[in-house]
Amino acid sequence: MQSINFRTARGNLSEVLNNVEAGEEVEITRRGREPAVIVSKATFEAYKKAALDAEFASLFDTLDSTNKELVNR
């Protein structure tokens, strides 16, 4: 992952976006702040889907446990 500061990113935005389009993740740092990461839309959507899948799996595990407890009463 490439890591650059905000000023460099702003001055080279076209190049940064070209790198992201080519599949690279770019971290942008700002003095005293949490860094941000730029990724392609496809990568971002894959991350979101994975997070939602994990959340649904957790919910289904909870529901399954609850159902088993109710059946075994």
Swiss-Prot record:
Antitoxin component of a type II toxin-antitoxin (TA) system. A labile antitoxin that binds to cognate doc toxin and neutralizes its ability to phosphorylate host EF-Tu. Does not reverse phosphorylation. Bacteriophage P1 lysogenizes bacteria as a low-copy number plasmid; phd and doc proteins function in unison to stabilize plasmid number by inducing a lethal response to P1 plasmid prophage loss. Binds to its own promoter repressing its expression; toxin doc acts as a corepressor or derepressor depending on the ratio, repressing or inducing expression. This is Antitoxin phd. Residues 50-73 are annotated as: Sufficient for antitoxin activity, its presence prevents formation of a doc-EF-Tu complex. The concentration of phd in P1 lysogens is far greater than that of the toxin it antagonizes. Such an excess may assure the well-being of carriers of the addicting plasmid. Keywords: Repressor, Toxin-antitoxin system, Transcription, Transcription regulation. Signal peptide: none annotated. It comes from the Viruses. Degraded by the ClpXP protease. GO terms for biological process: negative regulation of DNA-templated transcription. Belongs to the phD/YefM antitoxin family. It holds the Pfam family PhdYeFM_antitox. Homodimer. Interacts with cognate toxin doc, the exact ratio of doc:phd varies from 1:1 to 1:3. Interaction with doc prevents both kinase activity and dephosphorylation of EF-Tu. Gene3D superfamilies: YefM-like domain (3.40.1620.10). Changing Y47A: Decreases repressor activity, binds DNA less well, inhibits doc normally. One of its GO terms (cellular component) is protein-DNA complex.
